[in-house]
Design a protein with these regions (language model features):
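C-terminal beta-strand-rich structural cap/linker in extracellular carbohydrate-active enzymes
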Residues: 180-214
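Aromatic- and carboxylate-lined catalytic core of secreted/periplasmic carbohydrate-active enzymes
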Residues: 59-103
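Structured loops at beta-to-helix junctions and adjacent beta-edge loops in soluble globular domains
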Residues: 59, 66, 129-131, 204
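Carbohydrate-binding surface patches
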Residues: 105-164, 197-200
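Glycan-recognition surfaces
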Residues: 1-69
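Short, exposed beta-strand/loop patches in secreted or surface proteins that constitute
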Residues: 115-118, 177-184
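C-terminal accessory region downstream of the catalytic core in glycan-modifying enzymes
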Residues: 163-175
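Hydrophobic, well-ordered secondary-structure elements that form the walls
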Residues: 56, 126-128, 169-171, 201
Length: 214
């Protein structure tokens, strides 16, 4: 990848396993160089559109499909995804990745859920997808994994986990009731009710206060 600016992450442009492939490729292709395609069909439900658009948060967003035949409601879901992507662009470009969820026995037929945490010292992007039998899963992930590891190790008083807040959410509107997303002690809890559903949450952390300065 040092010889080119970008590459298409896979030929799997319309399949449910896209988020699994895209996340695993973080090990070999920088997300800013990995083109993730959201192929939108005029028959797609809003749930499916959000699922496809959330895939693109694992790399460089690309859009195709029946884009000239979509309804206003379908385009609203796409526009919301584009707006969210712009807010998350910096952490996609500059962050590090950790993947949580069930180990997949088959990449072609994923099950349960996957949660990808992409983070810097100031921002965190959590992208959750449910797969077959994944609806109702209780997702519980650290939003700043390295900071939490430090917090449990040497000098916990130097790591401030209290200044974390959710700044944006992208999901199917009916799936993100307030009781389905919560943040406590640096961990984000998300509960999606249906199989093949997705949600993305962007968080920010205030810089730690230097207690040695007066």
């Amino acid at each position: 990848m040092s010889l080119c600016a970008m590459a298409s992450f896979s030929d799997a442009h319309e399949l449910v396993e896209i988020p699994v492939i895209a996340a695993y490729l973080h090990r070999v292709i920088h997300p800013a160089q990995s083109q993730i395609w959201a192929v939108i069909r005029e028959t797609d439900s809003i749930q499916r559109i959000v699922y496809s658009m959330a895939n693109t948060l694992l790399g460089r967003m690309c859009l195709s499909g029946d884009v000239t035949n979509l309804s206003e409601k379908q385009w609203q879901a796409i526009d919301n995804g584009i707006d969210f992507y712009k807010k998350a662009a910096a952490v996609i470009r500059d962050g590090e990745t950790m993947i949580f969820g069930s180990r997949q026995a088959s990449l072609r037929h994923p099950s349960a859920y996957q949660a990808v945490v992409r983070y810097t010292d100031r921002q965190s992007l959590v992208v959750v997808h449910t797969f077959e039998n994944g609806g109702g899963s209780d997702v519980n992930v650290p939003v700043f994994p390295v900071l939490m590891a430090e917090n449990q190790a040497d000098e916990p008083e130097t790591i401030d986990l209290t200044g974390i807040k959710v700044t944006a959410v992208y999901a199917e509107p009916c799936s993100m009731d307030k009781d389905r997303i919560s943040l406590e002690n640096g961990r984000l809890k998300v509960k999606l009710q249906k199989d093949f559903e997705a949600a993305a949450i962007l968080l920010e952390r205030k810089p730690a206060v230097d207690k040695t300065k007066k």
